[in-house]
Amino acid sequence: MASKSQVPYEDRARDHPNPLARRLFQIATEKQSNVAVSADVTTTKELLDLADRLGPYMVVLKTHIDILADFSAETITGLQSLSQKHNFLIFEDRKFVDIGNTVQKQYHGGALHISEWAHIVNATVLPGPGIIDALAQVASAPDFPHASDRGLLILATMTSKGSLATGQYTELSVELARKYKGFVLGFVASRSLEGVETAGKADDEDFVLFTTGVNLASKGDALGQQYQTPESAIGGGADFIISGRGIYAAPDPVDAARRYQKAGWDAYLKRVGR
């Protein structure tokens, strides 16, 4: 798979065929940031407080909305307001993994109404092509008002030790991304997918790569998480770095967000030769 990692964000913002990807790279260029904060807190107050304090330094806020003990409509209106105030996108890390009929209901209905507020969601291709088709159908429905502002990341590899998301699984991830490129922004992966080759490559192909498990200080945790530094992640092909505990659990989360912003941006400038 071809990589556009050497191309500056502003050029990708101008040329990208996907409108949400264009917006993502525009925000990154304006804020000089490639940081996505994974705010794995358990109350609405904590989540909105972090989003407000860290908003100026991040491009994306990644949520696990189902771990909130007090989720309500106020949670969503608060997130939407802060997204507009600080110009960041919301990524609900739902990791859809079920049959198509079920994931459509999880995405577009249920208690969480994810399609109404999350710009980005993610899914695994373990159930086969039907899961991507089902999610894409929701976003392309004639009566869905947010079509140009919604996108999917496919979970192509994982940072947990012993992950089975390798080989044929990763190849299928790339194949389905190419098939549904109008809806699929790119991948969540621990490394560049440049060496993964499948049919269907297009000249304007430019999939966005998010890398999780980015931490300036730690090598991992007791539950199998394996960390990378911002420099190693960006140098390895990541367009955006996702950090959770390294930022929100720091003694001063704002200072931590600034440090990750600088480290990630410096690594990006080095990658594009600036």
Swiss-Prot record:
Organism of derivation: Coccidioides immitis (strain RS) (Valley fever fungus)
Active site per database record: K95 (proton donor)
Name of the protein in its database record: Orotidine 5'-phosphate decarboxylase
SUPFAM superfamilies in the cross-refs: Ribulose-phoshate binding barrel
EC identifiers of the protein: 4.1.1.23
Residues involved in substrate binding: 40, 62-64, 93-102, 227, 245
Uppermost EC category: lyase
Keyword Lyase appears in the UniProt entry: yes
Keywords, sorted A to Z: Decarboxylase, Lyase, Pyrimidine biosynthesis
Pfam family name, one: OMPdecase
Pathway: Pyrimidine metabolism; UMP biosynthesis via de novo pathway; UMP from orotate: step 2/2
Outcome of mutating I76V: In strain: RMSCC 1695 / CA3 and RMSCC 2267 /CA1
InterPro entries per UniProt: Aldolase_TIM, OMPdecase, OMPdecase_AS, OMPdeCOase_dom, RibuloseP-bd_barrel
Listed CDD domains: OMP_decarboxylase_like
Record-stated family: Belongs to the OMP decarboxylase family.
